[in-house]
Regions:
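Structural detector for short beta-strands of small beta-barrel domains
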Residues: 1-18, 79, 83
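Short solvent-exposed loop/turn micro-motifs enriched in small/polar/acidic residues
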Residues: 14-17, 45, 57
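Short, basic/aromatic beta-hairpin or loop at an interaction surface
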Residues: 15-31
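Terminal membrane-proximal soluble interaction domains of membrane-associated proteins
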Residues: 23, 52-55
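Short capping micro-motif at the N-terminus of alpha-helices
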Residues: 33-34, 75
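Short nucleic-acid-contacting surface segments enriched for D/E, G, S/T with interspersed K/R
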Residues: 36-53
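Short, Lys/Arg- and Gly-enriched loop/turn segments at beta-strand edges
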Residues: 55-66, 71
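Short peripheral tails and domain-boundary helices/loops at the edges of structured domains
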Residues: 66-85
């Protein structure tokens, strides 16, 4: 499992894919969202302020808190997203 070192810092949502199944933050970090929370992240808007927390709980050990929307979702850190040119 990849470990994300920039927890407890403010980030913003750069992009979301597949109706909220995965998210990319401004620091190029890529996140797989817990299927039970994908209906929540499907509504999140680009530019929303996100705080990442490491919870160590279950299959999705990170919690993405969307301060803009007042919502949260469980997630897995997938690593850094790199666009193919």
């Amino acid at each position: 499992m990849a470990f994300y070192h920039r927890t407890r810092s403010e980030h913003w949502l750069r992009d979301k894919q597949d109706d909220g199944k995965s998210l990319i933050l401004e620091d190029e970090s890529s996140w797989e969202i817990d299927p039970e929370d994908q209906f929540i992240t499907a509504r999140w808007l680009r530019g929303s302020t996100i705080l990442v927390e490491f919870t160590e709980k279950g299959e999705y050990p990170y919690l993405l808190r969307n301060w803009t929307e007042g919502e949260r979702a469980r997630a897995n850190f997938l690593g850094e997203f790199r666009a193919v040119s």
